[in-house]
């Protein structure tokens, strides 16, 4: 999101308005291994959330009971024709990952978002994210 000072009493004005597929807040809800889906309870305190807004993403891993922080990363993203691509601008766990791009195939089924590809470590992954209501 880009903003600019209007230099008057009305404050700030949002100037970007890119709304891409998948925009919103998502909770990691499971993985697919072979043909088996394994879901996790998103009401548990350990969470990974991914926020997608105006062509930018951020993920954060945290614990809602202890307020522990496990990591974060983010940058820009695109989602079109079944391909979700992240361009990493920051990554708290390994700054050597900054500047890389990760591409995934994606499929949205109802409130679920499936994405499949290689992790930032190069390992195969097939994740399931569930849309988080405000």
Report each predicted region and the residues it spans.
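An anionic, turn-rich surface loop/hairpin at beta-sheet edges
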Residues: 86-105
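Hydrophilic extracytoplasmic domains
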Residues: 105-134
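A short, structured loop/turn motif at beta-sheet edges
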Residues: 16-20, 76-84, 107-112, 133
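N-terminal helix-cap/turn-to-beta initiation motif at the start of protein domains
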Residues: 10-27
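Short, surface-exposed coil-to-beta transition loops
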Residues: 7, 42-46, 69-74, 98-102, ...
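N-terminal glycine/threonine-rich, aromatic-flanked beta-hairpin/loop signature
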Residues: 40-85, 91
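Short, solvent-exposed aromatic-acidic interface loops
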Residues: 8-13, 33, 64, 89-94, ...
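Conserved small/polar residues in nucleotide/adenosyl-binding loops
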Residues: 1-5
């Amino acid at each position: 999101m880009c903003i600019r000072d209007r230099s008057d009493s009305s404050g700030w004005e949002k100037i970007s308005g890119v709304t891409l597929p998948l925009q919103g807040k998502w909770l990691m809800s499971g993985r697919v291994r072979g043909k088996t889906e394994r879901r996790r309870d998103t009401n548990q305190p350990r969470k990974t959330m991914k926020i997608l807004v105006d062509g930018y993403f951020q993920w954060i891993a945290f614990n809602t009971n202890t307020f522990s922080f496990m990591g974060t990363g983010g940058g820009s993203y695109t989602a079109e024709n079944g391909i979700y691509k992240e361009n990493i601008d920051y990554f708290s766990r390994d700054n050597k990952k900054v500047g890389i791009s990760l591409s995934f195939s994606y499929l949205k089924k109802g409130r679920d978002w499936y994405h499949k590809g290689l992790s930032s470590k190069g390992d195969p992954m097939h994740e399931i994210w569930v849309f988080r209501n405000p």
